[in-house]
Amino acid sequence: MPNLKDLKNRIASVKSTRKITKAMQMVAAAKLRRAQESAEAARPYAERFNAVMAGLAASVGGSDSAPLLLRGTGSDQVHLLVVMTAERGLCGGFNSNIAKLARVRANELLAKGKTVKILTVGKKGRDAMKRDFAANMVGHVDLSGIKALGYANAQDIARDVLGRFDAGEFDVATIFYAKFQNVVTQLPTAQQIIPAAFEAEGESDEVALFDYEPSEEAILADLLPRGVATQIFSALLENGASEQGARMSAMDNATRNAGEMIDKLTIEFNRSRQAVITNELIEIISGAEAL
């Protein structure tokens, strides 16, 4: 039979844990609202930017004068995987799902004889990827000291990636992040950013409505680096909302599980205490009968 003191200590411990998880749930809920608003506010700009770039890219086509960021190196031998996760845990499967998608892609590429290089953004992604791909790691971006991610942070990451591309370190770059759907659903996503892969929305004839000065190629050469930064910034915002949604959901589950455990331990405590009282009564009655 469990010791009553041990049961009381366990109940007190679980109650303390429940207070912590409840507080974390409330903090995540507050952060989620801000992160979700930021992600949703950025989507129209990103979508419109994507549409403009798609039109420009379509007008240039496969021209030899097209910027290198658009036409690529002509090879897909070396791949850079930019794995974007959180700095902290306690957010369900958010980090592990992104890392899992990146690992699957890395293994597929390696099986095809491709060279894989990995750049991580966020501590959890680095920890997850280095277990299996330590030899493939080429860099890490630490965001632990940043309270609110901004476009400047995306520009820093973009400069790192673009610098590696200009140096001929890779042919194709893909970012991995979680696209926010709702509080309980965050979709692990892989998106190619180099060579630029823009998808046009609407009729393709819309491209002919615009005349560009000085030229499509010149405008693309200026906008494509910004496009990389914009895509990375969008991924950071989606990740931020997804992380808080996953943490809120995970802490809600933890709080409910703690409540159920407290109920079970309380029942066990009451039964044990009742058994102790019953035994004491039996001893008293037995002693009285002996007299």
Swiss-Prot record:
Its main location: membrane. The keyword Cell membrane applies. InterPro entries: ATP_synth_F1_ATPase_gsu, ATP_synth_F1_gsu, ATP_synth_F1_gsu_CS. Keywords: ATP synthesis, Cell inner membrane, Cell membrane, CF(1), Hydrogen ion transport, Ion transport, Membrane, Transport. One of its GO terms (molecular function) is proton-transporting ATP synthase activity, rotational mechanism. It comes from the Bacteria. Belongs to the ATPase gamma chain family. This is ATP synthase gamma chain. The lineage of its organism: Bacteria, Pseudomonadati, Pseudomonadota, Alphaproteobacteria, Rhodobacterales.
